[in-house]
């Protein structure tokens, strides 16, 4: 029988399983940062705002595919195994990445260009729908007793490494290439780099071992049974979706949308926006395992409640302070404050979500809740934030969207743990 990774091999297991997360976030961040260049290449329009909104709409379309991927691929992983499923998601994600990198512009192939970019995003979204769930469940099942929050936090921590690497590459391009060169062809270079690392990630994932928890399961549910169980637990899925809303909205605001927000709304330089994003990625990387470890010690609920309340009280004031006199220092401080919210909350939230899902549908349940939240909240954050600024004329208006997500997180935490306290669903760890 395949053995669960030993303590000595834990780091290697975490590295192998989170490598796909790295690729996913690397591509998503690039799409957000180079949105203005992608808009000009694939969506020519008289209005820069219209072209940018079309680009963010395509970006968001990938998130609409996530729930479908969560159900289809999540059911496969729960039935066949974690390792095999994660290999398939990586292959699909790689195809989407390659397509976006290679598609000629609108001037070359006309309407086919935006259509192919859309297909690439849909493929990425389909695979990403289960990537986070599959990785989170894998990490939770290899975690040592009392450390599940710390282990699962590395799912998101790996994404922060991708953000830092992508931002460093972008900064290098801005230093070595001119604006016209980046606009015409330079923005594609990071996407090609993403394509080049796909074979390495395949090699890493091939050496993954199946988790002992999955191998010991005597019952392997069929697809119909999985869907029936999900339907019976729709309240848990709904609460889980709202629970994720806080983390996914904050994350996509401080990473994917921030570079565009800094350049087009606050009129900061591209280099300043990239440096801020790098600092945010590093900050996220630090706070995520801290949040997970603290939740292992004091419970998930105190961390989740405390952070959502803090976000509700402080978000609008700090956004007003930023937009009153926007500069590099203020933007850095505000986004690092939001980074603290994200890291602490997400560190506890991922572990909590794996614990409340019924064991036989843990991957599909987690992935569906996460994907719905990402589609409704996170994926649309750039478009909604852009629209809020355009419609209201208030540069701080995206703060209202962040507060809405925090309110969802607070409500979900209250509802979910009230049900757990009443015995609605048993869990495996201290909540």
Swiss-Prot record:
CDD domains assigned: MFS_CitA
Domain of life, source organism: Bacteria
The protein's role, per its UniProt record: Uptake of citrate across the boundary membrane with the concomitant transport of protons into the cell (symport system).
Miscellaneous note of the record: Allows the utilization of citrate as a sole source of carbon and energy.
Protein name: Citrate-proton symporter
Topological domains annotated Cytoplasmic: 1-25, 73-84, 130-161, 205-235, 295-301, 354-363, 419-431
PANTHER family to which the protein is assigned, alphabetical: ALPHA-KETOGLUTARATE PERMEASE, CITRATE-PROTON SYMPORTER
GO CC list: plasma membrane
Outcome of substituting residue 422 to R: In transposon Tn3411
GO biological process, one term: citrate metabolic process
Positions on the Periplasmic side per record topology: 47-51, 106-108, 183, 257-273, 323-332, 385-397
Membrane topology: Multi-pass membrane protein
Transmembrane segments: 26-46, 52-72, 85-105, 109-129, 162-182, 184-204, 236-256, 274-294, 302-322, 333-353, 364-384, 398-418
NCBIfam families tied to this protein: 2A0106 (TIGR00883), PRK15075.1 (NF011656)
Keywords, ordered alphabetically: Cell inner membrane, Cell membrane, Citrate utilization, Membrane, Plasmid, Symport, Transmembrane, Transmembrane helix, Transport, Transposable element
Family: Belongs to the major facilitator superfamily. Metabolite:H+ Symporter (MHS) family (TC 2.A.1.6) family.
The keyword Ligase is assigned to this record: no
Subcellular location: Cell inner membrane
Location (main, coarse): membrane
Molecular function (Gene Ontology), one example: symporter activity
């Amino acid at each position: 029988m395949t053995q669960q990774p030993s303590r000595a091999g834990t780091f290697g297991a975490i590295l192998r399983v989170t490598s796909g997360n790295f690729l996913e976030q690397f591509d998503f961040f690039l799409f957000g940062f180079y949105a203005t260049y992608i808009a000009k290449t694939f969506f020519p329009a008289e209005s820069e705002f219209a072209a940018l909104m079309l680009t963010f709409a395509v970006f968001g379309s990938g998130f609409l595919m996530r729930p479908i991927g969560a159900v289809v691929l999540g059911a496969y992983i729960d039935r066949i195994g974690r390792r095999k499923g994660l290999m398939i998601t990586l292959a699909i994600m790689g195809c989407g990445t390659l397509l976006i990198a290679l598609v000629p512009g609108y001037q070359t192939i006309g309407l086919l260009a935006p259509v192919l970019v859309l297909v690439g995003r849909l493929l990425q979204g389909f695979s990403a729908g289960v990537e986070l769930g599959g990785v989170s469940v894998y990490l939770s099942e290899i975690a040592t007793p009392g450390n599940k929050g710390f282990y699962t936090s590395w799912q998101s921590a790996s994404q922060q490494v991708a953000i830092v690497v992508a931002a460093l590459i972008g900064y290098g391009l801005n230093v070595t290439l001119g604006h016209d060169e980046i606009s015409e062809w330079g923005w594609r270079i990071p996407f090609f780099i993403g394509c080049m690392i796909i074979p390495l990630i395949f090699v890493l994932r091939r050496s993954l071992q199946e988790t002992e928890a999955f191998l010991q399961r005597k019952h392997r549910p069929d697809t119909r049974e999985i869907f029936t169980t999900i339907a019976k637990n729709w309240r848990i899925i709904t609460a889980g979706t709202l629970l994720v809303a806080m983390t996914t909205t904050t994350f996509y605001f401080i990473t994917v949308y921030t570079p565009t927000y800094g350049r087009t709304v606050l009129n900061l330089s591209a280099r300043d926006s990239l440096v801020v994003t790098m600092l945010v990625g590093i900050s996220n990387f630090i706070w995520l395992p801290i949040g997970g470890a603290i939740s292992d010690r004091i419970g998930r609920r105190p961390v989740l409640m405390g952070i959502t309340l803090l976000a509700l009280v402080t978000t609008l004031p700090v956004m007003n302070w930023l937009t009153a006199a926007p500069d590099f220092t203020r933007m850095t401080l505000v986004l690092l404050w939001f980074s603290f919210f994200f890291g602490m909350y997400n560190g506890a939230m991922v572990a909590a979500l794996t614990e409340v899902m019924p064991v036989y549908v843990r991957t599909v349940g987690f992935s569906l809740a996460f994907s719905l939240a990402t589609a409704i909240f996170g994926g649309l954050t750039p478009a909604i934030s852009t629209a809020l600024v355009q419609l209201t004329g208030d540069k701080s208006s995206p703060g209202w969207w962040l507060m809405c997500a925090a309110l969802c997180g607070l409500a979900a935490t209250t509802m979910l743990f009230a049900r757990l306290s009443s015995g609605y669903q048993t869990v495996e760890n201290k909540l």
